[in-house]
């Protein structure tokens, strides 16, 4: 186990030792020491977004398979570098977009994919609404935390109360580390929208929208947002926080609609939900348990239900929406070359500057 917080390290070690009734679990502060052991098959990564890229690339080079949390990456250039490393070294990757292993989401996506509501006219995706907070209160670094390592490639800043407690949760609302609810949930509901449309390896061509950002204080990610994504076939997907669009994914076809969120699947007409997919139709990967699907893929060397390219393309939509809102401009995106046309300012936001000594 590995963590920059000693309390977390010790807690994780105890959990493993208790499970195996011994004291053999090794605990590390530096992920490079764990990855470099030479006797591992796979690793599970649950890190702040700004720390997603470097450990993944390092683990791929070391020949390890990986289960990693969404969002896949904090920037598009990081995501592409991660995908390239995973593919180059032939590693299995499962993104933690566990809704793909939930029957309701799977069933909704396969019905849409097989034309049960006709030709798709538009898509709506609702994500959670964010929040704001007052000024940060600078504090001494907890003695159990390696703050320098926690920051890693992100810009340096003094340790603070993070608004509500410590750094292990509230980092999500600070752009140096995350994109707020938008990027936190893009890997869930945008991911399902893509699955139903067969867009797992592509993306939109035009993105524009607006976000509402805190005027002051520690948090600087948008707490409200709405943007549209136009795809090559002309279909427009609208993504917004749940005060504007109900949370979940909704496809509108010329023969009806299907809406799915956690704990709910509905449609008009309702009878469409009773339909099955025939032998000659499109069959999506059926996973009944997300982590078991990953373990099975390690053994078979087949793609799991949420492989690297899928995770990358899903978060790319959220990241492009972020860029469109930050610049206030319509973004013209080429999903094949992964370039923004005729906008150097927007293009600069495709990557992130790394603090020394870290490099991508």
Predicted features and spans:
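Acidic/polar loop patches that form or flank catalytic/metal-binding clefts of enzymes
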Residues: 119-123, 158-161, 199-209, 236-239, ...
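Non-transmembrane alpha-helical segments in soluble domains
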Residues: 13, 32-35, 44, 56-60, ...
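Rossmann-like dinucleotide-binding domain that binds NAD(P)(H)
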Residues: 148-233
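A contiguous active-site-proximal alpha/beta segment in oxidoreductase catalytic domains
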Residues: 65, 72-149
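N-terminal glycine-/serine-/threonine-rich beta1-alpha1-beta2 phosphate-ribose binding loop
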Residues: 1-68, 74-92
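C-terminal helical cap and adjacent loop that interface with cofactors, partners, or active-site loops
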Residues: 177-201, 216, 224-226, 245-360
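Conserved beta-strand->loop/alpha-helix structural units within folded catalytic cores of enzymes
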Residues: 45-49, 64, 68-69, 94-98, ...
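NAD(P)-dependent dehydrogenases' Rossmann-like dinucleotide-binding region
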Residues: 116-134, 146-160, 205-214, 238-241
């Amino acid at each position: 186990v590995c963590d920059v917080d000693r309390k977390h390290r010790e807690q994780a070690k105890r959990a493993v030792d208790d499970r195996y009734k011994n004291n053999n679990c090794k605990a590390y502060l530096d992920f490079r020491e764990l990855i470099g052991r030479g006797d591992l098959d796979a690793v599970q990564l649950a890190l702040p977004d700004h720390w997603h890229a470097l450990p993944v690339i390092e683990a791929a080079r070391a020949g390890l398979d990986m289960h990693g949390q969404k969002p896949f990456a904090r920037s598009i250039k990081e995501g592409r570098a991660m995908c390239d490393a995973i593919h180059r070294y032939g590693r299995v990757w499962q993104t933690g977009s566990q809704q793909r292993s939930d029957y309701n989401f799977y069933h909704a996506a396969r019905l849409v994919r097989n034309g049960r509501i006709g030709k798709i006219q538009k898509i709506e995706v609702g994500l959670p609404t964010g929040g704001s907070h007052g000024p940060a209160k600078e504090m001494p670094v907890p003695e159990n935390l390696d703050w320098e390592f926690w920051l890693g490639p992100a810009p340096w800043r003094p340790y603070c109360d993070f608004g509500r407690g410590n750094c292990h949760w509230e980092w999500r609302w600070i752009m140096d580390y995350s994109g707020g609810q938008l990027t936190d949930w893009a890997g869930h509901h945008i991911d399902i929208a893509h699955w139903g449309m067969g867009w797992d390896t592509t993306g939109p061509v035009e993105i524009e929208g607006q976000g509402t950002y805190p005027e002051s204080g520690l948090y600087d990610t948008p707490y409200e947002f709405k943007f549209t994504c136009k795809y090559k076939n002309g279909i427009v997907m609208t993504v917004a926080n749940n005060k504007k669009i109900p949370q979940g994914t909704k496809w509108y076809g010329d023969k009806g609609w299907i809406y799915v969120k956690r704990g709910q699947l509905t449609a008009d007409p309702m009878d469409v939900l009773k339909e099955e997919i025939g032998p000659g139709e499109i069959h999506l990967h059926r996973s009944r348990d997300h982590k078991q699907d990953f373990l099975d893929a390690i053994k078979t060397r087949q793609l799991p239900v949420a492989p690297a390219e899928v995770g990358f393309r899903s978060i790319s939509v959220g990241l492009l929406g972020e860029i469109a809102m930050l610049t206030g401009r319509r973004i013209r995106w080429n999903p094949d070359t992964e370039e923004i046309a005729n906008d150097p300012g927007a293009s600069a936001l495709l990557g992130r500057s790394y603090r020394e000594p870290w490099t991508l």
